[in-house]
């Protein structure tokens, strides 16, 4: 805890989010912009708010987020993971509910590397018999 802020780091794919929460009115600021402005798609905003809705703290915290790397979906997932960890830092009693919903676990799926002689990670060149 830094002063009256609680902190959580979230990661998803290549995105990393540093999340700071404190008691407040429910404002979420991502990289200096309101969450509605930063995440253009509705799905991104929904993903970010999931842990707050689950715990019933949607209007209870002011949240500041710094996020970098990856794309929109990866960043939304990283912010969700960071908010979850910050909520657990604030109140450890919330962990079972968040864990049950699957928000505590870091999604370990990463992009598979492209292999030599293949077009993509697994897509091979077309085989010609003759």
Swiss-Prot record:
One of its GO terms (biological process) is translation. It comes from the Bacteria. Keywords: Ribonucleoprotein, Ribosomal protein. One of its GO terms (cellular component) is cytosolic small ribosomal subunit. The keyword Protein transport does not apply. It holds the Pfam family Ribosomal_S9. Belongs to the universal ribosomal protein uS9 family. This is Small ribosomal subunit protein uS9.
């Amino acid at each position: 805890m830094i002063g009256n802020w609680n902190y959580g780091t979230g990661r998803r794919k290549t995105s990393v989010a540093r999340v700071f929460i404190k008691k407040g009115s429910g404002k979420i600021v991502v990289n200096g912009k309101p969450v509605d402005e930063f995440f253009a798609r509705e799905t991104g905003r929904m993903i970010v708010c999931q842990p707050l809705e689950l715990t019933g703290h949607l209007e209870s915290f002011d949240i500041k987020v710094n996020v970098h790397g990856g794309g929109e979906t990866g960043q939304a997932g990283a912010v969700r993971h960071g908010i979850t960890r910050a909520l657990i830092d604030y109140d450890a009693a919330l962990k079972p509910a968040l864990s049950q919903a699957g928000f505590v676990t870091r999604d370990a799926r990463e992009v598979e590397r492209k292999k030599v002689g293949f077009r993509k990670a697994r897509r091979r060149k077309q085989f010609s018999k003759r």
